[in-house]
């Protein structure tokens, strides 16, 4: 009959502790009025409590610091620091001690040890200490693997390891939107506005130290998150840069193609890389975190070979009364002459006046034509001008143009300002 051998005791002990900043001590003040039964008892106890602030005993926040009571949360972008100690609990001298610390993520295994050289010997009651640091760049499960190998006085080689599993959480929720700029009504420019919505999804406030956009080589960027007041730039978020838990901020940036790229329309068309956001924040007692998004990609406006833009349109029109708009149609092709047909499709609120399906004639490469159109609205309120279709008779390709612009439709009894 086989008997399992007893588990061998190791001569060395391994301790691993996470290093984090302390927190301010908080207490729950219990007070009452002097006319109540306890009298001044509670107030006197709070004054005698060393953790309270002298003269402001009823404040929950004290002057003392407390060490972390648990492992806590680790968020993406923060620096994970850990203290590793190997102590010789025996009465023997241990030789050739090698301590190795690896961090296993879902995609890679990283060596965090400061030195891979073995320590010649470790006397009784002595220890080997090491501090490791790692900027966390992945979310999900992480495993810290600490391995220790050594040689006993009898020449026996020993080895053991311990595993410490922890989760890395997401601190911020970042959403981006792109808007194509318009130069009054004449044409759509190559300028792009980026709106970045950043939400704090942790349970503690953050100090937003920096939120910047690092543009790609094709663009120059202008931050639109401050205003000029009396010659001084003031943040649109006020003097306090704190982002409370579950609060959201919106940052705005304007990107404009550099001259050498703006002149080459083919480069800007299609999917273009805009750049990446660089976010730096601080939390408890100045602990810093940093996130960089992946390269933000934006689909350039799908003009195809034909671009339609507005030259003129009224802001306000009367209900059920015709009004006029002027459209500009541009052949974006540099080689091919187009023969276009214009169709006007009514919507539930917008009705086009005129002949649909008319020939516009030949449009040469890189040339434009202006077209006056008449329409009316049967519904009050802010209405979207939609329903224009241009068909290239040679390729049998139709270009659809909806949400071209918006007009405010009011009752005829309301005077329309010029």
Curated annotation (Swiss-Prot):
One of its GO terms (cellular component) is TRAPPIII protein complex. It holds the Pfam family TRAPPC13_M. Transmembrane segments: none annotated. Part of the multisubunit TRAPP (transport protein particle) complex. Belongs to the TRAPPC13 family. This is Trafficking protein particle complex subunit 13.
